Amino acid sequence: MKKSTLTLGIIAALGAAWIGGAWYTGKVAEEEYVHQFELLNQNIQQSFSAKGLSVEVSQVAIERGLLSSKTRYDIVVKDPNKPESVFTLPFEGTLYHGPLPLNQLSQLNLVPTMFTSVDNLVQNDTTISWFKVAKGENPLSINTTMNYQRQGATKMHFAPVDISNEKDTWHLGKTNLTLDFTPQGIRQADMTVDKLVYQEADQKKRIQFNDIKAMAEYQPIKEWDLLSTGQQWIAAGETNIEETDEQGKTNLLTVKNWKIDLNTVRKEAFLDFAMNLKLEGTQLNQIHFGDLNLNMAFNHLDGEILNQVLHAKFAQTEDTPLTDAEIALLRKFFDKQPQFAFHPMLTTQAGKLAADIDVAVATSDLATLSRGKIFSLFHHFIFKVNSDKAALVEVASAAEQISEKVEKAQADRTAEMKVNDSLKTPIQQGILVDEGKHIKLDLVLENGELKLNGKVIPEEQVASILFLAAMSMGY
């Protein structure tokens, strides 16, 4: 037998096997394709139902072919309180059968895959306005890939749009959203937006975000339907907020970079929630204020009670006074001794301004307030301040330049004088401790005793102490 004949025979056999595999996989892929929509509906219903919206994928239809299938489906958005408000987003596309989908094979991608799909938004009465502002590009295209372990990703591409009316203009740049999923449903979402701009028609206000990125990873908690664990973050590059006042002066706030991190962890019947905010290169009218790093934590939150509180909140149709049952629920929540921590720090070229507040609630019995026993409400209470004097002067100088519109040299002299004057009395009274280039304050509840900088003080003096400390640090 000639080698060429043998080669052709092998190719033909492989081709037949591929086509046969694609035909068989097509049936399995179609079933899994529909199943993924069922899982998606469960995920989005859980997310939107508490917010008073109904969102679901419906009218899923498949026309099977040899190597691919034609698909159609609708995404329907309803407001249960407004039956006339129904928005239907129709999609059409192609489901490519594995194990080697045609669209992957054409790109020399030989990774075995159960299916890939490519779907595009279809123009109708609801979407026609979206097509117009997308300027010829399909407003929304969706690409999905799933492997034989039933894991994969859905990538959504939103075309840039410009939306204008009599009051304002919006520009949303190129946007991409990726949803990673497992057999249990969506587990992580990643989003990028190259630019978002808002501008008022009279041009008195303009806000621009550049290079927006976000990630959300979560695990639902079966017994607490409105809660989940996991990490989320959102970040952006240079952000500008420009506003013109009634006198015609334009103020420009610029943040070079910013990021917000969130993290929720379950510890048996309780949840710990943490947040971090970073603002880098903050300027107002080109006057530098430094970098802000803010850490917050809400720990030891009773999951069952918190879930009930959220249900009660979402059930409200308007702002109404708390019912007796809701007040009792909140008191029960605080009786579980939740903890709150707040740690801001501002870093400037001259130094740092830092504070620590750490409070754990002991009881919800507010009757102790009428007896003047404020700190009996707390399991522990910590309030600390640690600041560089030079940093205080630098921040005060920046505020002076903006409020009084003076040159930096004059603002520096005025700021130094005012800071020194404001610190004098609290230092003399022992509220603040002078450590040369630094000042500090330690107010700690320890073994039932309230200590200021290591010395026990009467509880009734706390309000005046905190007031004087705030006044001295405020400038």
Language model features with spans:
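Glycine-rich, small/hydroxylated-residue low-complexity segments
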Residues: T5-G9, A16-Y475
